[in-house]
Structure formats: structure tokens, C-alpha cells
UniProtKB/Swiss-Prot annotation:
It comes from Methanocaldococcus jannaschii (strain ATCC 43067 / DSM 2661 / JAL-1 / JCM 10045 / NBRC 100440). This is Uncharacterized protein MJ0488. Pfam families: HcgB. It comes from the Archaea.
């Protein structure tokens, strides 16, 4: 079985040689496999409502232990990419196969991002939402849509 590092190395070499022409099926399959076969997932939030939405959807995709981060991640809003920072914080303090983080995309007003990272912090998939001023949905509904979209971007249907 080909491992993620080999897939990444091959893609790097193709890019360096200017012969890369988009994603390959084996790359997509490896990402799907990592998500579906995850045994432990850490959700980078200590908000029970957000956690429940993500947990309920992910249990339809994989049979994993899904854990909520037990620290406050609001200080990530002080960084340039809060959602990604939350995921990396989770990676640094908990061992897992996948990390799911959701937060502001960038500058205040930029909207939000939900991102799924692997055990090395590589982005496997993500989705974006406009500012809440535009979409006007409650946070649980928005997170549900973001996670379903992030999964569908890599061919995992809910």
C-alpha cells in the first residue's frame, strides 16, 4: 500500500519538473482512506454545541473515538489564520489521526473556515463560509454545512 509521504513526494517531483497536471485519483483515495479509517479524531473546540454537530456527522463517516479539546481556543483569533491555528494547537497537545478545527478565516469580517488536518498537520480538506453578517444562520447549522461540504470536496457523501 502506498503511503501519504510517497504520494506527496511524487507530487512534489512532478511540480518541480513542471509536469503536474492536477490531482490524481490515488491522491484523493488516500485522503478518503485517512478520514474513513481514522480511529481517533480531536475537534479543536471546547464548545459542546459545536462539538456535537461535528461528532454526529463524523460518526456517519467513520468509527472513531471523537474527543473535544479541553482548552479554550479563542486566543487563536489573535492570529492571522485562526481556524488553522486552532487545528495546529490541537495537533500540538493531543495525539490523533485527524484534527477538525473551525474558526475565523483571517481578518475580522473574512468569514469562517472548517479544516480537517491529518496527524502531521497536513490539510486534507476544508470549506469556507461567508461572514455571518451575510449568511445569518445559526452556528450549528453553518458548521454542519461546512463539514458536509469539506467532506464532499473529497468525495465523501453524507
Amino acid at each position: 500500500m502506498i503511503v501519504m509521504e510517497e504520494i506527496i513526494k511524487k507530487a512534489f517531483i512532478e511540480s518541480i519538473n513542471n509536469i503536474r497536471r492536477g490531482d490524481k485519483e490515488e491522491e484523493l483515495k488516500k485522503i478518503q482512506e485517512k478520514i474513513v479509517n481514522a480511529k481517533k479524531i480531536v475537534v479543536a473546540t471546547n464548545n459542546q454545541k459545536k462539538f456535537k454537530v461535528i461528532r454526529d456527522i463524523m460518526l456517519r463517516v467513520c468509527n472513531a473515538e471523537i474527543k473535544m479539546l479541553d482548552i479554550d481556543t479563542r486566543f487563536a483569533d489573535l492570529t492571522r489564520m485562526p481556524a488553522l491555528t486552532k487545528g495546529l494547537i490541537a495537533l500540538d497537545i493531543e495525539k490523533a489521526d485527524l484534527y477538525i478545527a473551525r474558526g475565523r478565516l483571517g481578518a475580522p469580517g473574512s468569514g469562517s473556515m472548517l479544516v480537517i488536518l491529518d496527524e502531521k498537520g497536513r490539510v486534507l480538506t476544508a470549506s469556507l463560509s461567508p461572514s455571518s453578517v451575510i449568511h445569518k444562520e445559526d452556528i450549528e447549522e453553518r458548521i454542519k454545512k461546512e463539514l458536509i461540504e469539506a467532506l464532499s470536496r473529497i468525495g465523501i457523501s453524507i
